[in-house]
C-alpha cells in the first residue's frame, strides 16, 4: 500500500506533492497519483518520479488519500474512490463547501480532514487551515500536520 495517494494533481495537488517530496516526508515510490488526463499523469511522473494510477480507485488505495479535484467533481470522484478506501485511511479534502459530515457520509471513511490551502503553498510558504473529523487520534493528526507543514504552515 502506498503512503500517500493524490486523486487529482492540478496546481494545488502539484504544490502539495512537491512539498511532500522536498521535505522528505516520503519517497516518490511511496506516492501514487491519478489525474483526469494522461498528459497530466505523464508530466507528474516525469517531474516527480511518482507512481501513476490507471484510475482514481487505485490512487485511493493508500494510507492517506488527498482529494485534490475541483468541488464540482467530488460526487463522481468519491463514487470512484469510496470502494477502494481502507478502513484506516485518512481522507483529506481541499474542496471548499464540502463539510466533514458530507465527506464522511459520501466516502464512508472514519478519518476525515478538511484543508484550506492557499497558493503560496506552491513555493512552500502556504498557510493552511486544518479541520479534523472526530475519527482521528493524535498520531493521525500528527501525520496530517507533517503533511501540511511540508508545503508551509498549518493551523
Placement of each model-derived feature along the sequence:
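General beta-strand structural signal in soluble alpha/beta enzymes
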Residues: 54, 93-94, 111-117, 154-155
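Rossmann-fold NAD(P) dinucleotide-binding segment
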Residues: 50-107
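Active-site capping/gating segments
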Residues: 114-129
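NAD(P)+-binding Rossmann beta1-loop-alpha1 motif at the extreme N-terminus of oxidoreductases
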Residues: 1-47, 51-54, 60
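Internal alpha-helical scaffold of NAD(P)-dependent oxidoreductase catalytic cores
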Residues: 102-111, 127-155
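Short acidic capping loops at alpha-helix termini that bridge into adjacent secondary structure
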Residues: 27-30, 87-89, 111
Amino acid at each position: 500500500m502506498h503512503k500517500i495517494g493524490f486523486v487529482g494533481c492540478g496546481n494545488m495537488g502539484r504544490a502539495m506533492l512537491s512539498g511532500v517530496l522536498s521535505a522528505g516526508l516520503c519517497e516518490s515510490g511511496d506516492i501514487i497519483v491519478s489525474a483526469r488526463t494522461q498528459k497530466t499523469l505523464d508530466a507528474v511522473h516525469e517531474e516527480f518520479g511518482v507512481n501513476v494510477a490507471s484510475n482514481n480507485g487505485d490512487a485511493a488505495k493508500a494510507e492517506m488519500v488527498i482529494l485534490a479535484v475541483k468541488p464540482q467533481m467530488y460526487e463522481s470522484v468519491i463514487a470512484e474512490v469510496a470502494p477502494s478506501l481502507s478502513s484506516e485511511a485518512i481522507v483529506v479534502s481541499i474542496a471548499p463547501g464540502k463539510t466533514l459530515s458530507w465527506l464522511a457520509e459520501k466516502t464512508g471513511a472514519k478519518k476525515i480532514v478538511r484543508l484550506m490551502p492557499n497558493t503560496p503553498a506552491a513555493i512552500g510558504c502556504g498557510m493552511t487551515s486544518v479541520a479534523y473529523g472526530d475519527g482521528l487520534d493524535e498520531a493521525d493528526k500528527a501525520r496530517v500536520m507533517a503533511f501540511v507543514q511540508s508545503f508551509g504552515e498549518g493551523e
